């Protein structure tokens, strides 16, 4: 028996521990780093300077999950056309989004029911681009103004401030630790949404050299603030949530059964704020209307409020560890 151990029982426990670790390593459930700079207790009486640091692997990365699930549960691959008029490059060309009315994208976040919009290439505030899971709260946190001062500049909007201060502070510490920083694109347009989701996706991301028609005067083209991680959905997020059979422009979603209600999981039959600005005036933004279409909303401040559904992107180290995405067994998240 090794003299470091008091008796045969302790030695056997040590051997069994090593065998267990070896099996887990072979199965890929854990990984390890070897070091001789720290102490670890193998038993109540034995210390060793040479230790193995164990890292438990749980779940799949966002991209691994998407590639395994694409074509099932309503998850579909979308490919964008990228050109030099946009703030994004070829790394953003491929997304995976949940589409239609019959989707299994329920996820538990902050001990609440949220939904997965998709696995989307996302740029953080340091300029890193990774495939990350974008989620939206299943229900509204209430009806509010987009901006209490009557401006369609999202960086200074009162709703933006509320979401990243008052609302953020209601989240659990676990939930806060799962949220990654995100660059938000603030482009819009200067007429009714008589264009498709693909076109709107590009409008939302127009760069500074091509800002005319997509931003009101000097409104910023994006928000790159590490302290503002939470926003609301893009018009294109709502558009892509419709069935693949939906070919209508966003404005006419209300008139196409393939685009709304039972064929669009984001349609709640409620006026709901969207992120894009209406670039033709200072106090107008886009929203989903009561009948499922998307149009400029003049209620940004003057005459009313709309539902608010917080949206955020999880950090890249957050993985889906269990569940099947149904409302009965929503996906569960873990940090690796």
Where are the regions that the model predicts?
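N-terminal start-of-chain detector that recognizes signal peptides
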Residues: 12-13, 26-27, 88, 282-283
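Short, polar/proline-rich extracytoplasmic segments that appear immediately after membrane translocation
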Residues: 14, 20-61, 324
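Long, domain-scale functional regions
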Residues: 59-336
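N-terminal Lys/Arg-rich, disordered targeting/topogenic segments
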Residues: 1-11
């Amino acid at each position: 028996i090794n003299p470091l151990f008091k008796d045969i029982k302790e030695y056997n426990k040590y051997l069994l521990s090593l065998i267990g670790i070896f099996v887990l390593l072979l199965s890929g459930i854990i990984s390890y780093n070897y070091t001789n700079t720290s102490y670890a207790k193998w038993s109540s009486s034995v210390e060793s300077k040479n230790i193995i640091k164990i890292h438990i692997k749980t779940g799949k990365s966002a991209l691994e999950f998407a590639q395994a699930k694409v074509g099932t549960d309503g998850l579909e691959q979308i490919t964008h056309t990228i050109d030099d008029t946009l703030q994004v490059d070829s790394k953003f060309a491929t997304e995976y989004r949940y589409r239609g009315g019959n989707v299994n994208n329920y996820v538990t976040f902050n001990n609440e029911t949220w939904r997965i919009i998709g696995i989307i290439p996302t740029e953080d505030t340091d300029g890193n681009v990774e495939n990350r899971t974008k989620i939206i709260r299943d229900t509204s946190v209430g009806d509010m103004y987009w901006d209490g001062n009557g401006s369609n500049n999202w960086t200074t909007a009162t709703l933006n401030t509320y979401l990243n201060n008052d609302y953020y502070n209601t989240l659990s510490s676990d939930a806060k630790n799962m949220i990654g920083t995100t660059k938000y694109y603030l482009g819009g347009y200067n007429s009714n949404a008589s264009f498709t989701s693909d076109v709107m996706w590009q409008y939302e991301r127009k760069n500074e050299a091509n800002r005319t028609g997509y931003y009101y005067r000097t409104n910023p083209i994006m928000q790159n603030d590490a302290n503002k991680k939470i926003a609301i959905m893009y018009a294109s997020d709502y558009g892509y949530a419709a069935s693949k059979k939906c070919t209508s422009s966003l404005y006419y979603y209300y008139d196409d059964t393939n685009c709304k209600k039972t064929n669009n999981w984001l349609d709640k039959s409620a006026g709901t704020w969207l992120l894009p600005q209406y670039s033709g005036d200072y106090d107008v933004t886009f929203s989903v209307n009561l009948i499922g279409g998307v149009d400029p909303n003049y209620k940004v401040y003057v005459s009313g409020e709309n539902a608010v559904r917080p949206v955020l992107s999880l950090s890249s180290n957050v993985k889906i560890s269990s569940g099947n995405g149904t409302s009965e067994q929503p996906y569960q998240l873990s940090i690796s």
